[in-house]
Amino acid sequence: MAMRIAALLFVIASTVFAQVPVAPSPGLAGEPLGTNVQNYNIVDSFETGYRFSTVGGSFEQYRSSVNFGDGIRLLGSSLMVNSKNGHGRLFDQFTLSTQGLGNDPYESAVMRVEKNRLYRYDMSWRRNDYFNPGLVTGGGDGQHLLDTQNRMQDHNLTLFPQSNLKVFAGFSTSSQTGPGYSSIQLFGATGNTFPLFSNVHRVWREYRLGNEFRVFGIRVNWMHGWEDFKDDTGATLAAAGVPVAMPGPLPAGLSSFQASDPNHGTNPYWRAAIFADRGLFHLNGRFTYSGGRNAFVVDERSQASSPARVQNVITSGNGDRPVATGNLNLSFTPTSKLTVANSTSVYNVRTLGNSYFAEFDSQTQATTVLFYRYLGIRTVANDTNLNYQVSHLWGFMGAYHYSERLITSQQQFTFAGATSSNPAEQSNQLRSGEAGVRLTPWKPLSVLLSAEIGTNSHPFTPIAGGDYHTLTGRVQYRAKTFRLAAAVKADYNANSVSLTSYAAQSRTYSVNGNWTPLSRFTIDAGFSRAHTYTIGGIAYFLDQQLFQGQSSIYLSNINSIYAGVRYTIRSRIDLYLGYTRVQDLGDGRAAANAGVGSAPALFQAVQTFPVAFQSPMARLSVKVNDKLRWNAGYQYYGYQQDFTSLLGYRANTGYTSLSFSF
């Protein structure tokens, strides 16, 4: 259930940024055509100002989803320098744009430098503050926390970018650093839980080199890369700073705890692609191979003084993970009305090596050992699609999809001196057909209807597609100043595996449109509703007793609405008003434990998750002169959970700034 709540919180957080934050301002200062300096034309705009925020309610929830604070910022900047005749001395184009510099939680910079026919260099840099207070654990009182920074950057150099012979070189890196808190239960299922502190340190780097050329009219592109990953995060007993105080004194003290779990890996890879166009025939193909190699060790040692007890857990492993993929796509267009396309793809991944797990308990004098040796997955798929435009009024399409997957694994288990091997193999075939029709009864009006039905002989997981069908429809009306579109999609899936069963249905309805009666006035709005209902069989142990024949149920009804109005007064004042609201109505119950079905009350309380988020905003931008604009904006963030009121928040944010051009 925590995964479902986390997924819903991700949707809410994504919606926060689906509506562009009120700052920076979209309007730029300066002359649109720029200023000429010697052989270059320069267009620049910089926006600097003060951002403010006040938060009521759960500050941790606000930080995990919005996180804007107070202070002076370089909210945004844009610089573009172009040579006037395409023959600059050192470069012909230079562009630089930034956002949020000066301690915003989301900072970025993008740069390009190009010299025609000689080189092109692209750079991007981002820094995100990642704050995760573990709000979905312990009813919001969990002892898990991450307060880290993610830094990412990419560098790409292309030599001879306009020629038939190109050379590529690149470098990328990302890192995550900062403090983290977690917890661990020691000395049995009834043992105490202890807080842990971790200094998170994860680094990923990639180096790449490639080339593109043409031979016999075929364009060939290849790339060779090397990836390196290191995670040196460990854990010690937390002495202070635990997010929530431990409930009550611990009956058995923990005198020491130390965990070391380095995880290092490399992944050299090759990528190749070909593209060919022969008039009626179009061909493209791609092939990738990566030879991942990884090694890890987890060494946990805990010692209790009362009663005296020592527990050691050691997990180690090393292995190779070669992955090969390939696809070949063919398209045939014998007439302007008919297109036939076929795609064949192959995916093969193998995990080879040993994973060793051992646990020793000084009180029970027991040792458990588990080996994991091999996992292989091979998938072959083929898709055939046909599109035919009968007339300007209507056309139709049809498709057939087939895939076959083979999964093999090998495990070895040692317990009390006895060793057993557990090989397993599974194969399944997925077949589906799709048909649709396109109608244009009137030039401004278009209609698209389609349906897909599929069956899987042996689904790999309970939630995978078994016997399913999908229905979709879309209608759009487009005029010169007005556009209105509506869509509907319904998915139904029934799956039964050897141990349990699973069924799901979802329906999505949406309508959106925009109207621009005048060049200075625009209205944009939309609404969508997503209904999801899932039910799956579950089996579990409670107090060493097996419970079966029960169901896990989840219901969701998410309504989303957005609207925006832009109005310009005398080409000097820009006004924008916007509103976004996302609400999951759940199943309408008044209390968390008023569930459905025969599952225990604990399960019924997590069958639905009613939550609401809204964010109105207003922004004003006034042109003072050709090189200066004054901006101000306000944005409200409101979030509430119906069954956990302590996790709601209300935030008033805003800014005032000056946009200027040199």
Please report, for each region that a protein language model flagged, where it lies by residue.
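Positively charged n-region of N-terminal signal peptides that target proteins for export
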Residues: 1-5
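Gram-negative and organellar
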Residues: 19-38, 42, 51-662
